[in-house]
Amino acid sequence: TFKENVFTSLFPRRKEVPKTLIFAKTDSHADDIIQIVRDEFGEGNEFCKKITYSAENPENTLNDFRNQYYPRIAVTVDMIATGTDVKPIECLVFMRDVRSKNYFEQMKGRGTRTLSKDDLQKVSPSASENKDHFVIVDAVGVTKSKKSETRTLERKPSVSMKELMMNVALGDKSEDTLTS
């Protein structure tokens, strides 16, 4: 299990759990994970927190996760999955599958930020070196599941919705029409 391996094989010289981000399927799933993590580690509310759009003060909690000692573990559904920079994250735990290749790459990107030893020690005092790697814990087979390519819509701004609908109704099945 994660708890058993975090101090032995994953981060053997650490005294505190490295900053860890857990990806959950739903808000309810996130709540269940938080309770289990707190129970397993024997820690209180500050140790593991939910950072979702529906959580209380998600921006404050995210800022604490980024810059403070607590929380050590954050659980999210989608809020931190893309476009959020939390450099001290050293471990990603996937408790949900992801079908989109691009989305999965963005989720993995949460762990890719490098950090100097001095900056890492501000939130993880027992860190003894620069952060130059991260660990993925795949609890659900997300690294092996088939991913689909996604593409952006290429809507032609000069074509109105009415005109697009008319073209489809008249049998136009061209790629340009169907992706606009």
Predicted feature descriptions by range:
Residues 1-74:
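Conserved C-terminal RecA-like helicase domain
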Residues 14-22, 125-135, 158:
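Glycine-rich, flexible loop segments associated with nucleotide phosphate handling
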Residues 26-35, 135-145, 167-169:
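Short, charged low-complexity intrinsically disordered segments located at boundaries
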Residues 30, 58-59, 101, 133, ...:
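Alpha-helix initiation and N-capping motif
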Residues 45-152:
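Conserved RecA-like P-loop NTPase helicase motor core
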Residues 140-180:
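Long, largely alpha-helical accessory region at the distal end of helicase-like NTP-driven motors
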